[in-house]
């Protein structure tokens, strides 16, 4: 299985335990810096899966950062519709509903049940640093513009 970025893995022993249970790939938590990722699953001595294969490290590399999930659909709520009778109004808002600060600065985007960053995260120029940290996969999240 793939260990997603919302599973709180912040240490090598925790990652090794998930690998023992069958994880083959780890998507690092969004807030972890590359040096921490490299310490948890170093490229020169990676955690191995239950089949003695190096566990693959992946990071979120492009798009709005998924910050939180809710049982409520914010898009349906915005349009005063019940969640189960929304008619997929989210399709009309491909990048979600932008929330701004009181100063008018973009803050968050509400996209269905997800709260996302308003700004797009982009690691395109960081290929060398990613490789040095042992990252072998980059997760991309599409958006309607500039992708």
Locate each region found by the language model.
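Active-site pocket-lining/capping segments in soluble small-molecule metabolic enzymes
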Residues: 1-13, 17, 21, 27-147
């Amino acid at each position: 299985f793939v260990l997603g970025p919302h599973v709180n893995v912040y240490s090598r022993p925790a990652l090794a335990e998930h690998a023992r249970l069958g994880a083959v790939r780890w998507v690092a938590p969004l807030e972890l810096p590359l040096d921490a990722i490299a310490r948890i699953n170093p490229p020169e001595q990676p955690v191995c899966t239950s089949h003695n294969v190096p566990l693959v490290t992946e990071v979120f590399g492009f798009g709005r950062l998924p910050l939180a999930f809710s049982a409520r659909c914010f898009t349906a709520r915005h349009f005063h519709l019940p969640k189960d009778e929304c008619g997929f109004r989210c399709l009309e808002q491909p990048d979600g509903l932008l929330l701004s600060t009181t100063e008018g600065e973009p803050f968050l985007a509400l996209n269905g049940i997800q709260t996302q960053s308003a700004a797009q995260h982009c690691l395109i120029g960081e290929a060398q640093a990613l490789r040095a940290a042992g990252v072998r996969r980059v997760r991309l999240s599409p958006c309607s513009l500039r992708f």
